[in-house]
Amino acid sequence: MFEWIADPEAWISLVTLAALEIVLGIDNIIFINILVGRLPERQRQSGRILGLALAMLTRILLLMSLAWIMKLTAPLFTVFNQEISGRDLILLIGGLFLIIKSSGEIKEAINHQEHHESESKNKVSYLGVLIQIAVLDIVFSLDSVITAVGMASHLPVMILAIMIAVGVMMFAAKPIGDFVDTHPTLKILALAFLVLVGISLIAESLDIHIPKGYIYFAMGFSVVVEMINIRMRRLMK
C-alpha cells in the first residue's frame, strides 16, 4: 500500500495532480460560495467547509468505485444515432441544473431589492444548500476523478492529492467568497462563468469536447479586465 513512497514518479504525480485538482475545483469553489452567500452570515463559513468536505468525500468515494465509473461510459440507449451513457446523463442533468440555477441568480441580482433579498435569504435552509452542493459535487467530481485516474497509478496518491487540494480550497474559499460578495459585478461574472461551465457540461454529454483551458482563459481574462475596472472606480472616487 505504501510502496509508492519510494517511487519518485509517484511524488511527481502527487504534486501535479494536487495542482490540477485545485484548478479543476475553481468552479466548485465559485458555486459553493454563491450558494452559501444566501445563508445567514453565521452559517456561511461552516457551509463552505462542509460543502468542500462533501466534495472531498464524493471524490474519494468515486475513486474507490473505479469499476462503477468505468461502466458509466457504456451506452445505455441511443437517441438520433447518439449513444447515451450514464456519464452523459449525469453531465447533461448537471449542466442544465447549473445553467438554470446560475441564470436564476443573475436574474435575481439584476432585479435586486433589499426587502426581496432579505425574504429570499430566510427561505434558504442550511440543509437545502448542503443538498444542492452534494448533488453538484457529483457532477464536478467526474472530471476530477477521471483526471486522477489518467494521471496516477496508485490509489493512495490519488486520494492524498484530492485531500491536499481540498485543504488548500478550504483556506481559499472564504477570501474568494468575501471578495466576490464585496464586488457585485464580480458575482455576476462568476455566475456567467458557471453558465459557461454548464454549457460545456451539456456539450461534453453530447460528445462535443470544449477544452477547459479555453473556458479558464476566458474567465481569467474577464477577471483581469474587471479588476482594472474596480481599480479605476476606486481612483475616480
From Swiss-Prot:
UniProt entry keywords in alphabetical sequence: Cell membrane, Membrane, Transmembrane, Transmembrane helix
Pfam name, any one: TerC
Membrane topology: Multi-pass membrane protein
Listed transmembrane segments: 12-32, 49-69, 90-110, 126-146, 151-171, 188-208, 210-230
One annotated Gene Ontology cellular component of this protein: plasma membrane
Record flagged with keyword Cell membrane: yes
Stored InterPro entries: Integral_membrane_TerC (IPR005496)
Domain of life: Bacteria
Localization, UniProt: Cell membrane
Keyword Transcription regulation: no
Family of the protein in this entry: Belongs to the UPF0053 family.
Name the UniProt record assigns to this protein: UPF0053 protein HI_0056
Organism (species): Haemophilus influenzae (strain ATCC 51907 / DSM 11121 / KW20 / Rd)
